[in-house]
């Protein structure tokens, strides 16, 4: 894939909402939210952000590459842990300002806490309490990342 001029210029509303050209809208920080979901189960795995270059890299290699807002660097998911996310499909919303990545999660999980999903708790309706939703740890993050 040619990495230059990958994305179409943003056109009018009709072109953005109904057209056949991918022209993502990045926010004022140059980022677009990307929700990774298991391609088979549709379970939400994690929410991360991409900049233009990380999205290009993702399209080129077929694996999720994010932009780390805290470290200010590219984050090839699984480069350290081996828990890569193979891209099955990328969807964009009507405004092309948010992405859903349907992925094949390789390895024990997507979450740095050792769980398959970062969404392992739910808010009890009408309260501010959280309850676990089956988020047992599937790997030891200290062993994988070398951090306590």
Mark where each language-model region is.
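C-terminal binding/interaction regions
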Residues: 2-31, 37-41, 45, 50-148
